[in-house]
């Protein structure tokens, strides 16, 4: 039993090393409000450290975040020339679940910075957030392991949410859920099979709306201007979608009345089957990311950290 648990722990550890986990760079409530430029540099340092461990941290919304709280321990103005500011700060780094309000990993780093102004002093102090630092590597690894463990335990609920969303024709939400499960997690294979299913449903559902818009533009103005507006909609019809035949029929109808150099039938969107599958997955992920960002709170401040 102990050996099995140890093996499972090792498996998660290895998976964490090879697995890309997406984190949202969040703002923590600070004792002293940081200027936007300083906050941006702090976010960039966090993103670089995470990237060094094979993952991604950016502004895209995910349930999981990385952030840093800053406690200024010492501040002094140094006489020049030039006059400068010296700081000693305590940086406390966190990786956690914003939705569940749970911290997965934390690390405190003491840092010093000197600059020609207070902002430069902070920015120089942030150099302590270095992906080559073994303690920071361990902090990120621990956070990733716990995120993987969370997905392994909760992927069923995620797939249920995806299924429920799809049943209500909320295919962008369904794609958000199924594309959120990392490749290294036990639910990924099951989720990946649903990506193509939900993407096809998304395309077919939306192509009916696209056809309505295209027909409306052509009906309102059956001339070159209306043809141009209709074609602007038709180009969004995916090859292989349930509306492809209708789109070609409308295209041919327009071409009979309006002479132009448009080429709808011969668009080379996909070179081969492998390219099609890859492009569909990328498109599905983009749809999911866009939906997730739409669900993002008005503020990304993490106010519950202590």
Language model region names:
Residues 1-20:
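Bacterial Sec-dependent N-terminal signal peptides
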Residues 60-65, 88, 157, 173-176:
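Short, well-structured alpha-helical interface segments that form or flank functional binding sites
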Residues 17-69:
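N-terminal segment of the mature soluble domain
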Residues 67-118:
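Amphipathic beta-strand/beta-sheet edge segments enriched in Tyr/Trp
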Residues 103, 107-213, 219-229, 239, ...:
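C-terminal/domain-edge helix-coil "capping" segments
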